[in-house]
């Protein structure tokens, strides 16, 4: 009700399906943050038991100088796709995980849908990669490239969807 009133004051409206899409996008972003920004072991029961007992740091931070030395600056996307295996799987996963970011940003905020998806994918991926520097997660240029392309692909899918369901 609050959002509906606020939109009405601005002379705008949003249907139930659009609001459901917004809710799904928020839930997806929360899941994406849980998957990418927190340390890999953060969600384990052992970590919580040890942290709550005071035997382990709740949210350990990695020194920036240490993280910067481990960044993979050379793109290996094509090589990973050619060779397949784990690298190929991760390349495809990085592309697909950001399709919803591009799709929902293009769906929810009007304008050039592909460009909106590309920019949102890039900015979100850049923020994730930057935050990963501080929590001991791997950061590399491939993630930024593939996540950005995934956002663009999501924007393109939204463009197709908009032609199929123009009133959504």
Predicted regions and their residues:
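Bulky hydrophobic segments
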Residues: 1-136, 156-168
